[in-house]
Amino acid sequence: MSGKKEVKAPKVVEALSAKIPCGPSELVFGVAHIFASFNDTFVHVTDLSSKETIVRVTGGMKVKTDRDESSPYAATMAAQDVALRCKELGVTALHIKLRATGGNGSKTPGPGAQSALRALARSGMRIGRIEDVTPIPTDSTRRKSGHRGRRL
């Protein structure tokens, strides 16, 4: 027995970093999950099964100050970055799933939702279906701060 070990070369695994092969007129769909709260806006693109992330950018990654994270400007910048990366990877069309905080929180999307959607459409991405997936409670837990009770 010699004291030397066999060294195996590491395997290189690339997940969706290669371009998706398709013709020029073919539409390759992804799913854009837009989560717009009043504190931040997330634009997260996955494949159709929503299992594998293609790209995720937030409004906070695009601006310096905390108060601007949820602004329409930050959402627009995030959506433009997402569209650019999607085109590099060969995704040409998106189904949109729009989400607000929901549950005990606000059920209306934040200020960045509409501008993010508009920026995706203007940057050349084809839009398939738009769906609101905000979680709506059927009977929820108690809201914070004695919600609007005892007002005389």
From Swiss-Prot:
- One Pfam family cited in the UniProt record for this chain: Ribosomal_S11
GO BP of this protein: ribosomal small subunit assembly; ribosomal small subunit biogenesis; translation
Its main subcellular localisation, reduced to a broad class, is cytoplasm
What keyword terms does UniProt attach to this protein? Cytoplasm, Nucleus, Ribonucleoprotein, Ribosomal protein
Task: Name the residues that span the membrane.
Answer: none
Please name the GO terms that the record assigns under molecular function.
RNA binding; structural constituent of ribosome
The entry's localization annotation reads: Cytoplasm; Nucleus, Nucleolus
Composition bias of kind Basic residues appears in 143-152
Q: Which domain of life is it from?
A: Eukaryota
InterPro entries named among the record's database cross-references: Ribosomal_uS11, Ribosomal_uS11_CS, Ribosomal_uS11_sf
Q: Name one GO cellular component term.
A: extracellular matrix
Q: Where is this region: Disordered?
A: 133-152
Q: Could you confirm whether the keyword Signal appears in this record?
A: no
Return the NCBIfam families for the record: PRK09607.1
Q: What does this protein do?
A: Component of the small ribosomal subunit. The ribosome is a large ribonucleoprotein complex responsible for the synthesis of proteins in the cell. Part of the small subunit (SSU) processome, first precursor of the small eukaryotic ribosomal subunit. During the assembly of the SSU processome in the nucleolus, many ribosome biogenesis factors, an RNA chaperone and ribosomal proteins associate with the nascent pre-rRNA and work in concert to generate RNA folding, modifications, rearrangements and cleavage as well as targeted degradation of pre-ribosomal RNA by the RNA exosome.
Q: Which PANTHER family match?
A: 40S RIBOSOMAL PROTEIN S14/30S RIBOSOMAL PROTEIN S11
* Record's subunit section: Component of the small ribosomal subunit. Part of the small subunit (SSU) processome, composed of more than 70 proteins and the RNA chaperone small nucleolar RNA (snoRNA) U3.
Family assignment from sequence similarity = Belongs to the universal ribosomal protein uS11 family.
Q: What is this protein called?
A: Small ribosomal subunit protein uS11
Source organism of this protein record: Dictyostelium discoideum (Social amoeba)
Q: Gene encoding it?
A: rps14
